[in-house]
Structure formats: structure tokens, C-alpha cells
């Protein structure tokens, strides 16, 4: 997804995607003026998950544990890593408790790499090493530029998405915003909306469930 917005006379572009090819969430932020991008980034996690946040180099780590369910203690634990590449100054700021952050100053563009993993292997095996999984995936992702990561993700996604086409001609009603199209559907000739929502459903399924993972209807 891509969002563009203005703050004063500076235009910012923010692009986010979860890569099917590299198991990393990428958030790219760009400004149309040099050195106009500054921000800080940290974790906000419910205390029930017993989060532990730490910084090492330019990497921010959070470890947490699953919560008890119906009197049964959780055997799950998770880890999340965040690393930032930017053309400005990237600094790790350690703080007490879970307030540690990464800061970016005087940048024009920044790429945020987010990796998450758990010790879950399957429904009767939780012997996985969340920390090792995260480290291996982050090491792999950092070898690629933003452009390489984006291209690899699109190529992998299209292997599935491009299998099916549904073409229904657009009408004047199809030019409206999507929420307006949905609201007016029963009283319009906007049959192209059927194709749009059909492909949206495919996008959701492809993005939420892949071979080796959990079925979409088992994800909460």
C-alpha cells in the first residue's frame, strides 16, 4: 500500500508491504525535500505479553511471551527485530523499561525492515528458536536494497495472483471512490465492482495464508 501526504510544504510518500519472497515487512518513507525526514520508532506491546525491549547497534529487539488461555499456560514465545537503513543519521536510544527507540534525523528516505518469528513449529511442537529465525531472516533481507525487495515480492506474489483474470467493463459509476461504489451498488450498473471485490478477496487469501502456514480461517 502507498500513502502520500503533505506536512507544510513537504510531501511524504509511505509504502508498506509484507514480502512473500523474503519474509520481511518493509516500510519505506520518502520526502520530496532533502533532509526533511526525521522520526523515532519504538514498540508498543500489551504488558500481558511480558515484553522485553532492547537495542544493539542500529537494531531494536522485542521479546514477548504468550498469555494463559482458559487456565492453560502458554508455551509460545516470540521475537521481533527492527532495523532502519537511511541516508540520514540513524541512532539507537536506550531507555529504562521498554522505552528504547531507533531515531532517524535529517534523512530524505528511510527503509524500515521488520522481522517477526515465534517458536511455533506445528500444533504439537513449539521447539522452534524465535531469535535464531529472526536473525537469519534479517541477515538475508539486509543484503537486498528496497528496490530489490519490492521487485522480488511482486514477482512472487504475481505467481499466484496472475493465474486468474476477471474482466467486466467499467461504466461511469465505476469511476467513483470504492466506498461510494459499494454503497450505490444495488442501484447502479457498476458490475465492474464484482471483479474488483473478487480480486480483493484473492489478494487477502494470498497474503494471509501460504503453504506451510496456517489456513486463513484459523487466524483468529
PLM-predicted stretches and their roles:
Residues 1-220:
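Aromatic-residue-lined binding/catalytic grooves and analogous aromatic/hydrophobic interfacial grooves
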Amino acid at each position: 500500500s502507498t500513502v502520500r501526504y503533505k506536512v507544510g510544504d513537504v510531501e511524504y510518500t509511505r509504502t508498506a508491504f509484507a514480502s512473500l519472497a523474503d519474509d520481511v515487512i518493509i516500510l519505506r518513507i520518502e520526502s520530496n525535500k532533502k533532509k526533511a525526514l526525521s522520526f523515532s520508532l519504538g514498540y508498543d506491546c500489551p504488558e500481558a505479553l511480558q515484553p522485553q525491549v532492547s537495542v544493539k547497534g542500529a537494531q531494536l529487539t522485542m521479546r514477548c511471551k504468550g498469555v494463559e488461555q482458559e487456565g492453560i499456560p502458554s508455551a509460545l514465545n516470540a521475537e521481533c527485530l527492527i532495523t532502519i537503513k537511511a541516508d540520514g543519521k540513524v541512532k539507537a536510544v536506550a531507555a529504562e523499561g521498554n522505552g528504547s527507540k531507533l531515531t532517524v534525523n535529517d534523512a530524505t528516505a528511510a527503509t524500515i525492515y521488520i522481522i517477526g518469528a515465534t517458536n511455533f513449529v506445528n500444533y504439537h511442537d513449539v521447539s522452534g528458536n524465535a531469535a535464531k529465525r529472526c536473525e537469519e531472516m534479517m541477515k538475508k533481507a539486509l543484503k537486498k536494497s528496497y528496490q530489490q525487495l519490492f521487485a522480488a515480492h511482486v514477482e512472487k506474489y504475481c505467481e499466484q495472483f496472475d493465474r486468474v483474470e476477471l474482466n467486466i467493463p467499467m461504466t461511469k459509476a465505476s469511476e467513483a471512490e470504492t466506498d461510494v461504489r459499494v454503497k450505490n451498488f444495488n442501484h447502479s450498473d457498476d458490475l465492474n465492482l464484482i471483479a474488483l471485490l473478487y480480486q480483493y478477496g484473492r489478494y487477502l487469501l494470498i497474503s494471509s495464508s501460504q503453504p506451510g502456514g496456517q489456513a486463513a480461517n484459523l487466524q483468529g
